[in-house]
């Protein structure tokens, strides 16, 4: 089976003084989360589309789904965890409790606050994860990347044509991800905040799918302005 895991567990601290977590803020008069869910509903391959949100915001999430007529029976809401990977594991726990987990099950995990992903990106994630077990969505780095250990001096400049910026979705064979996460120590779980990094550390290859420049993550007030400009300018190509 194929599942979507929508990660809506953030509280939006970088958004500043706002009354709601960032996933519930509006762009073009509609919550960011709803824009994102609408993209996933269009993909018939998904057996379930599972939104993980802070426990105290579950009722609000269910209310806005009703308000915006998200009636697709595949959409479920569960409580997120204390961090990104724990949230993904909560989604997997839901899957295991409801349907069990089969060897070829795939989960497509995606930031709720990336509302501009395309059908191509979603479907390529499904195809590549089903074939290879793990995939990340990336774009080539445009700017030169510099590294600094002391935040004052450059200690390394990586080769730019080997650098990519990670986006989401990140998609996995569920058993591979679950087994790789369970093998981590408590210390590793605190350090390895990215699911693809967990797979890399396990020794399994992670394939790449091409993202889009406009597949932005809306985390700051500036991002919110850019997101509205993308919609109003019809920049995102689906």
Swiss-Prot record:
Sequence similarity: Belongs to the IspD/TarI cytidylyltransferase family. TarI subfamily.
GO BP term, example: isoprenoid biosynthetic process
Taxonomy, superkingdom: Bacteria
Record's catalysed reaction(s): D-ribitol 5-phosphate + CTP + H(+) = CDP-L-ribitol + diphosphate
Binding site for CTP: 7-10, 81-87
Metabolic or biological pathway: Cell wall biogenesis; poly(ribitol phosphate) teichoic acid biosynthesis
PROSITE patterns according to UniProt: ISPD (PS01295)
Name of protein: Ribitol-5-phosphate cytidylyltransferase 2
Single GO molecular function: 2-C-methyl-D-erythritol 4-phosphate cytidylyltransferase activity
Site (Positions ribitol 5-phosphate for the nucleophilic attack): 160, 217
Organism: Staphylococcus aureus (strain NCTC 8325 / PS 47)
Site keyed Transition state stabilizer: positions: 14, 22
InterPro entries per the UniProt record, alphabetical: IspD/TarI, IspD/TarI_cytidylyltransf_bact, ISPD_synthase_CS, Nucleotide-diphossugar_trans, TarI
Subunit structure: Heterodimer together with TarJ.
